[in-house]
């Protein structure tokens, strides 16, 4: 028979352990690193990494963005309205402890609805980062952009592919995590999709009220067609 007192004692300890782990991550990346650490030295390498986010049937005709001096810029013009790029750490929620992690390289390829309504916010945030805007200022600017409807909620069907073997999405994953597709929905909808519930294939990320909900659905193969490991064999995101 289980002893309820054990759970009552250990749950606060578990919460404390999680909080300590978050504090350690925040301490590891308290501020922006030198900008060179976020760059990919060879432009062609960044293009190839961006295209690895999706199968060639999608990425070969997609627009490709690379990180420039003031923001992302078009390196390859597209034909199918998809956009591929390599996201950096500031794509995370404003309060994420890895917001300034210079190791993050997330190959990403967004579909047309996401390119119209999700990508512009990340591109603007990148411009702010490169201009030296603080996180608190970025929060205020984001809230103001939402109020004047410059930043919009994700369109229905907004999604992105993250199927690259070669990314580094977090220190927890230590690499690319699993190949997955991401769905973007208005803030606060993770529960509507059953995200994070026991045995649910959907994971969700809820950030602040000025950021959209992101849903993660692992898939069975990488962009090159090779099989992915089962979800339980991978580290956390």
What name fits each language-model region?
Residues 1-8:
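Bacterial N-terminal signal peptides that target proteins for export
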Residues 8-16:
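Bacterial N-terminal signal peptides
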Residues 17-21:
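Sec/Tat signal peptide C-region and signal peptidase I cleavage site
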Residues 23-237:
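Primary mode marks residue(s) on the alpha4-beta5-alpha5 output face of response regulator receiver
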């Amino acid at each position: 028979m289980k002893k309820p007192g054990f759970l009552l004692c250990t749950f606060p300890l578990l919460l404390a352990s999680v909080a300590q782990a978050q504090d350690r991550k925040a301490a590891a990346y308290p501020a922006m690193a030198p900008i060179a650490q976020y760059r990919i030295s060879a432009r062609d390498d960044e293009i190839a990494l961006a295209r690895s986010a999706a199968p060639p049937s999608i990425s070969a005709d997609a627009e490709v963005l690379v990180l420039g001096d003031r923001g992302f810029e078009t390196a390859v013009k597209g034909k199918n309205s998809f956009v591929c790029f390599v996201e950096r750490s500031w794509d995370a929620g404003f309060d994420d402890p890895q917001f300034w992690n210079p190791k993050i390289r997330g190959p990403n390829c967004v579909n047309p609805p996401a390119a119209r309504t999700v990508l512009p916010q990340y591109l603007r945030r990148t411009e702010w980062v490169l201009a030296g805007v603080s996180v608190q200022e970025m929060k205020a600017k984001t809230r103001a952009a939402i109020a004047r409807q410059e930043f919009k909620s994700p369109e229905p069907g907004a999604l992105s592919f993250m199927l690259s073997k070669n990314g580094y999405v977090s220190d927890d994953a230590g690499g690319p995590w699993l190949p997955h597709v991401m769905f973007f929905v208005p803030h606060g909808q993770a529960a509507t999709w059953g995200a994070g519930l026991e045995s649910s294939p959907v994971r969700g990320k809820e950030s602040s009220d000025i950021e959209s909900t992101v849903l993660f659905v692992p898939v069975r193969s990488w962009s090159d067609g090779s099989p992915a490991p089962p979800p339980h064999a991978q580290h956390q995101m």
